[in-house]
């Protein structure tokens, strides 16, 4: 027993086996990506930066039902509804989301009956101040306009699971 242990120690068998294992992985393609220049594909269910969507005719989708405000566990959404129109519909006067409070749970998106509020594919929205993370209606609509194609595609891919 002592002789085999001494032979292993003298011949450095563990070191040699570890070296060959390292060399095998050294020449394989790397599993990491060069992040700012390469990006992994994002799941259709990814929950990123919030956006308010519009109908194809340009009218905003939000009907001021306030379900998203009621269901938000972090109480990050504030909505003020405008007066009823002649056709009986309402629109929001104020729609604010405090992204510092938001926990990105997606309950607002699930509660919305007209798919007005969605969480888009953007995850790169770091800011220098906290005030920039307080999104108003104009910022949310701009996000919706910017990411509409990706958001519509994600909703279409996720439709069988809704």
Swiss-Prot record:
Gene Ontology MF terms in the entry: 4 iron, 4 sulfur cluster binding; iron ion binding; NADH:ubiquinone reductase (non-electrogenic) activity; quinone binding
Chain positions recorded as [4Fe-4S] cluster 2 binding sites: 72, 102, 105, 108
Protein EC: 7.1.1.-
Residues at which [4Fe-4S] cluster 1 binds: 62, 65, 68, 112
Organism domain of life: Bacteria
Membrane topology note: Peripheral membrane protein
Cofactor: [4Fe-4S] cluster
InterPro entries: 4Fe4S_Fe-S-bd, 4Fe4S_Fe_S_CS, NADH_quinone_OxRdtase_chainI
Enzyme class: translocase
GO biological process, any: aerobic respiration
CC cofactor note: Binds 2 [4Fe-4S] clusters per subunit.
Pfam families, A to Z: Fer4_7
Keywords: 4Fe-4S, Cell inner membrane, Cell membrane, Iron, Iron-sulfur, Membrane, Metal-binding, NAD, Quinone, Repeat, Translocase, Ubiquinone
Domain 4Fe-4S ferredoxin-type, first and last residues per copy: 52-82, 93-122
Coiled coil segments of this chain: none
Catalytic activity reported: a quinone + NADH + 5 H(+)(in) = a quinol + NAD(+) + 4 H(+)(out)
Keyword Membrane on entry: yes
Gene Ontology, cellular component aspect: plasma membrane
Cellular localization per UniProt: Cell inner membrane
Protein purpose: NDH-1 shuttles electrons from NADH, via FMN and iron-sulfur (Fe-S) centers, to quinones in the respiratory chain. The immediate electron acceptor for the enzyme in this species is believed to be ubiquinone. Couples the redox reaction to proton translocation (for every two electrons transferred, four hydrogen ions are translocated across the cytoplasmic membrane), and thus conserves the redox energy in a proton gradient.
Quaternary structure, from the entry: NDH-1 is composed of 14 different subunits. Subunits NuoA, H, J, K, L, M, N constitute the membrane sector of the complex.
Family affiliation: Belongs to the complex I 23 kDa subunit family.
The protein's name: NADH-quinone oxidoreductase subunit I 1
Organism: Rhodopseudomonas palustris (strain BisB18)
Gene expressing this chain: nuoI1
């Amino acid at each position: 027993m002592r002789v085999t242990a001494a032979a292993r120690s003298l011949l450095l068998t563990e070191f040699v086996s570890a070296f060959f294992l390292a060399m095998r992985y050294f020449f394989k393609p790397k599993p990491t990506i060069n992040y700012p220049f390469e990006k992994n594909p994002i799941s259709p269910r990814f929950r990123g930066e919030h956006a308010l969507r519009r109908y194809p005719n340009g009218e905003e989708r939000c009907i001021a039902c306030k379900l998203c405000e009621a269901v938000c566990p972090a109480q990050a959404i504030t909505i003020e509804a405008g007066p009823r129109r002649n056709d009986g519909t309402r629109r929001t006067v104020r729609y604010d989301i405090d992204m510092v409070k938001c926990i990105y749970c997606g309950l607002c998106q699930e509660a919305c009956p007209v798919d007005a509020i969605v969480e888009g594919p953007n995850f790169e929205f770091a800011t220098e101040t906290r005030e920039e993370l307080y999104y108003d209606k104009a910022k949310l609509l701009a996000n919706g306009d910017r990411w509409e194609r990706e958001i519509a595609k994600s909703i279409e891919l996720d439709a069988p699971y809704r």
